[in-house]
Protein backbone atom coordinates (compact mmCIF):
# COMPACT_ATOMS: atom_id res chain seq x y z
CA UNK A 1 0.00 0.00 0.00
CA UNK A 2 2.87 2.40 0.68
CA UNK A 3 6.51 2.65 -0.31
CA UNK A 4 9.38 4.32 1.48
CA UNK A 5 11.07 6.90 -0.74
CA UNK A 6 14.75 7.52 -0.05
CA UNK A 7 17.38 9.35 -2.07
CA UNK A 8 20.97 10.36 -1.38
CA UNK A 9 20.14 13.64 -3.19
CA UNK A 10 18.41 14.84 0.01
CA UNK A 11 19.76 14.62 3.56
CA UNK A 12 19.28 11.40 5.48
CA UNK A 13 16.67 11.49 8.23
CA UNK A 14 18.00 12.89 11.50
CA UNK A 15 15.62 10.71 13.51
CA UNK A 16 13.42 7.62 13.27
CA UNK A 17 11.43 8.56 10.13
CA UNK A 18 11.53 8.25 6.34
CA UNK A 19 12.35 11.01 3.86
CA UNK A 20 8.93 10.31 2.33
CA UNK A 21 6.14 7.75 2.03
CA UNK A 22 4.36 7.19 -1.28
CA UNK A 23 0.81 5.84 -1.18
CA UNK A 24 0.02 4.24 -4.51
CA UNK A 25 -2.86 1.80 -4.19
CA UNK A 26 -5.53 4.38 -3.34
CA UNK A 27 -4.00 7.01 -5.60
CA UNK A 28 -0.48 8.23 -6.18
CA UNK A 29 0.25 10.45 -3.19
CA UNK A 30 3.59 11.23 -1.54
CA UNK A 31 4.08 12.69 1.94
CA UNK A 32 7.55 14.10 2.55
CA UNK A 33 8.96 14.47 6.00
CA UNK A 34 9.94 17.98 6.99
CA UNK A 35 13.11 18.99 5.20
CA UNK A 36 15.63 21.21 6.88
CA UNK A 37 17.93 23.14 4.58
CA UNK A 38 20.76 20.64 5.03
CA UNK A 39 23.17 20.02 2.17
CA UNK A 40 22.95 16.25 1.47
CA UNK A 41 26.68 15.80 0.85
CA UNK A 42 27.80 17.46 4.09
CA UNK A 43 24.82 17.36 6.45
CA UNK A 44 25.48 21.03 7.19
CA UNK A 45 23.43 24.15 6.56
CA UNK A 46 24.52 26.27 3.59
CA UNK A 47 25.96 29.74 4.12
CA UNK A 48 23.47 32.56 3.59
CA UNK A 49 20.95 32.41 6.41
CA UNK A 50 17.25 31.69 6.08
CA UNK A 51 17.14 32.29 2.31
CA UNK A 52 19.86 29.71 1.64
CA UNK A 53 18.24 27.25 4.04
CA UNK A 54 14.81 27.72 2.42
CA UNK A 55 16.28 27.18 -1.04
CA UNK A 56 18.10 24.02 0.09
CA UNK A 57 14.99 22.71 1.86
CA UNK A 58 13.00 23.09 -1.37
CA UNK A 59 15.82 21.52 -3.42
CA UNK A 60 15.72 18.57 -1.00
CA UNK A 61 11.95 18.23 -1.50
CA UNK A 62 12.46 18.45 -5.26
CA UNK A 63 15.01 15.59 -5.10
CA UNK A 64 12.69 13.41 -3.01
CA UNK A 65 9.78 14.03 -5.38
CA UNK A 66 12.02 13.18 -8.34
CA UNK A 67 12.90 9.86 -6.72
CA UNK A 68 9.13 9.13 -6.66
CA UNK A 69 8.71 10.22 -10.29
CA UNK A 70 7.12 13.57 -9.41
CA UNK A 71 8.04 17.25 -9.72
CA UNK A 72 7.22 20.40 -7.78
CA UNK A 73 4.18 20.74 -10.06
CA UNK A 74 2.73 17.71 -8.23
CA UNK A 75 2.84 19.45 -4.83
CA UNK A 76 -0.67 20.10 -3.51
CA UNK A 77 0.11 21.16 0.10
CA UNK A 78 3.11 22.40 2.05
CA UNK A 79 3.76 23.27 5.66
CA UNK A 80 6.49 25.80 6.46
CA UNK A 81 7.99 25.98 9.95
CA UNK A 82 10.01 29.08 10.80
CA UNK A 83 12.28 29.72 13.77
CA UNK A 84 11.37 33.42 13.38
CA UNK A 85 8.12 34.56 11.72
CA UNK A 86 9.92 37.79 10.78
CA UNK A 87 11.61 35.66 8.07
CA UNK A 88 8.22 34.96 6.42
CA UNK A 89 8.73 37.40 3.51
CA UNK A 90 12.30 36.20 2.86
CA UNK A 91 11.14 32.58 2.69
CA UNK A 92 8.17 33.53 0.49
CA UNK A 93 10.51 35.08 -2.09
CA UNK A 94 12.53 31.86 -2.37
CA UNK A 95 9.43 29.63 -2.17
CA UNK A 96 7.77 31.41 -5.12
CA UNK A 97 10.73 30.50 -7.37
CA UNK A 98 9.90 26.79 -7.04
CA UNK A 99 6.25 26.90 -8.15
CA UNK A 100 4.84 27.93 -11.54
CA UNK A 101 2.32 30.78 -11.61
CA UNK A 102 -1.18 29.50 -11.03
CA UNK A 103 0.07 26.19 -9.62
CA UNK A 104 0.71 27.30 -6.06
CA UNK A 105 -0.06 24.58 -3.51
CA UNK A 106 -2.15 25.14 -0.41
CA UNK A 107 0.15 26.11 2.47
CA UNK A 108 0.36 26.71 6.19
CA UNK A 109 3.23 28.57 7.87
CA UNK A 110 4.05 28.71 11.57
CA UNK A 111 6.69 30.05 13.90
CA UNK A 112 8.02 27.35 16.19
CA UNK A 113 10.13 27.55 19.35
CA UNK A 114 13.05 25.71 17.74
CA UNK A 115 13.94 23.44 14.83
CA UNK A 116 16.32 20.46 14.82
CA UNK A 117 20.02 21.25 14.51
CA UNK A 118 19.29 24.95 15.00
CA UNK A 119 17.64 25.26 11.58
CA UNK A 120 15.88 28.45 10.56
CA UNK A 121 13.24 26.87 8.30
CA UNK A 122 11.77 23.42 7.70
CA UNK A 123 9.33 22.57 4.91
CA UNK A 124 7.23 19.47 4.28
CA UNK A 125 5.17 18.70 1.21
CA UNK A 126 2.37 16.48 -0.05
CA UNK A 127 2.45 15.60 -3.74
CA UNK A 128 -0.22 13.89 -5.85
CA UNK A 129 -0.89 12.84 -9.42
Enumerate the predicted regions with their spans.
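Short, polar/acidic, helix-capping and beta-turn segments at strand->helix junctions
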Residues: 2-129
